[in-house]
């Protein structure tokens, strides 16, 4: 429901007979910005927004970081937040969000806002004091300290269900077993004591660690349903052991460690693996062979994933696995997402995954920025134009494959080669096709930022695919 719809309803007198308690429930479903706007609709609505149960203060909506008087704007923003909560009429709140970058000069205001949330028995608390300009841990780690520490009153709050703290210090030992929220997200801080947090967290169902540094963690265990580890820096190379028998969503993005898996849910719903932080390489070496074995073994422990998303680095390295014990085994994956440059150095990795996904129904190519590597040269005997014809037949494809999706489609020959093969094999251009895959459609999503000349190339490629598609639908989405 949007602000315009509510305004239209009021004009037609559709809401005038509803009691205030229901109107408050309705406006609590709006974004905080739209909720505030309802105060100008009519006299009756003037103060209803003061009882919304979802409050969100975002500095970026109030302060233009490019203006000369940024300091005075931040002072005004802090005063606005304190004034707003001082006039709040409700007894309880569901959510309080504070997005205020490095508020070192406003600590008293921030603490009073948090105390307000605790007094209203908040369920979901977001404290994000990171700088929007930070793009990596190296940007944030230059600060020797975090200016805001989580107040003592938060640790004992029994109503808290979800806590997000970015660039905000906290003491894991102060959370008792019964007081830790079910969902915890930590980011943009030096984090050295994760294991003590996990040892005392039987109620924790979702843990997200993002852009932290100095991490020392060797065992990740618990009854969690969701685990996210994104773009963190470790204090040293280490063995990282996972014991997550009930996890349903698993996302790991960052450095390659010596991964060990004790237990993993064999019916896991969603797995995302991203090792692009390792960079790119053109020549194989002893390190890449070792990492190929590590990642192949890691995939085997995650082979129950219904949806699996992988990165170019994984596609390139898993083909280098030489240890028979770690060679890729058949997986249960039904939706495979390949984040790829469609470079020849990734082709064998793509084939390995296709060969080991016998239940695959949807194949997605998520194509992102091209590298400086040449797309016309071969890579250890793999040719960019001939590989798909020489190394794949209809027998290589999962018999269950129904949908192929291409995101950021550009119509370049690398994309067209693999799509031509998939379409031709799916529509019956191969001998013995009656036992082959049953491809139903190909979905092409163009990038809205493409130049006109690039768009023309993509249009030509899409038309060519449509001309050979037969019974296979080729759908083009041009934003």
Curated annotation (Swiss-Prot):
Residues of the F-box domain: 12-60
Q: What is the lineage of its organism?
A: Eukaryota, Viridiplantae, Streptophyta, Embryophyta, Tracheophyta
Q: Where are the LRR repeats?
A: 99-129, 139-167, 186-211, 228-254, 287-312, 342-367, 419-446
Record-linked Pfam families: F-box, LRR_At1g61320_AtMIF1
Q: Could you tell me what this protein is called?
A: Putative F-box/LRR-repeat protein At1g56400
**Which keywords fit this entry according to its UniProt record?**
Leucine-rich repeat, Repeat
Disulphide linkage map: none
Q: Which superkingdom is the protein from?
A: Eukaryota
The record, for InterPro entries, names: F-box-like_dom_sf, F-box_dom, FBL13/AtMIF1-like, LRR_At1g61320_AtMIF1, LRR_dom_sf
């Amino acid at each position: 429901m949007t602000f315009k719809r509510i305004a239209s309803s009021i004009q037609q007198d559709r809401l005038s007979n509803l009691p205030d308690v229901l109107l408050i429930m309705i406006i609590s479903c709006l974004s905080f910005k739209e909720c505030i706007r309802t105060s100008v609709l009519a006299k009756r609505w003037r103060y209803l927004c003061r009882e919304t149960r979802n409050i969100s203060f975002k500095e970026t909506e109030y302060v233009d970081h490019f203006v000369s008087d940024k300091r005075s704007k931040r002072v005004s923003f802090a005063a606005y937040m304190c004034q707003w909560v001082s006039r709040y009429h409700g007894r309880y709140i569901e959510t309080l969000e504070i997005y205020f970058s490095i508020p070192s000069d406003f600590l008293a205001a921030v603490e009073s806002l948090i105390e307000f949330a605790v007094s209203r028995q908040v369920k979901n608390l977001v404290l994000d004091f990171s700088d929007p300009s930070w793009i990596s841990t190296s940007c944030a780690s230059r600060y020797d300290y975090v200016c805001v520490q989580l107040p003592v009153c938060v640790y004992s709050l029994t109503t808290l269900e979800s806590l997000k703290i970015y660039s905000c210090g906290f003491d894991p030992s102060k959370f008792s077993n019964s007081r830790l929220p079910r969902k915890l997200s930590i980011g943009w801080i030096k984090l050295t004591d994760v294991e003590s947090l996990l040892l005392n967290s039987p109620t924790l169902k979702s843990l997200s660690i993002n852009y932290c540094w100095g991490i020392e963690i060797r065992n990740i265990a618990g009854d969690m349903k969701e685990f996210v580890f994104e773009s963190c820096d470790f204090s040293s190379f280490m063995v990282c052991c996972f014991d997550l028998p009930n996890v349903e969503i698993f996302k790991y993005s960052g450095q390659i460690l010596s991964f060990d898996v004790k237990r993993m849910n064999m019916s896991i719903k969603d797995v995302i693996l991203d090792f692009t932080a390792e960079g790119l390489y053109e020549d194989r070496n002893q390190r890449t062979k070792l990492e190929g074995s590590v990642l192949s073994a890691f995939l085997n422990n995650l082979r129950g994933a219904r949806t699996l998303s992988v990165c170019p680095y994984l596609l390139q390295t898993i083909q280098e696995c030489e240890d028979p014990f770690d060679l890729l085994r058949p997986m249960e994956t039904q939706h495979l997402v390949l984040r790829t440059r469609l470079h020849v150095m990734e082709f064998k990795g793509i084939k390995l995954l296709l060969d080991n996904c016998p239940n695959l129904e949807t194949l997605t190519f998520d194509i992102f920025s091209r590298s400086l590597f040449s797309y016309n040269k071969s890579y250890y005997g793999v040719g960019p134009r001939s590989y798909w014809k020489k190394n794949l037949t209809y027998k290589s494809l999962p018999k269950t494959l129904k949908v192929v999706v291409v995101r950021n489609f550009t119509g370049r020959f690398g994309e067209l080669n693999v799509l031509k093969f998939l379409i031709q094999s799916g529509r019956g251009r191969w001998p013995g096709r009656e036992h082959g895959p049953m491809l139903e459609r190909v979905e092409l999503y163009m990038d809205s930022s493409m130049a006109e000349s690039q768009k023309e190339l993509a249009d030509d490629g899409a038309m060519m695919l449509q001309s050979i598609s037969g019974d296979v639908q080729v759908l083009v989405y041009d934003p």
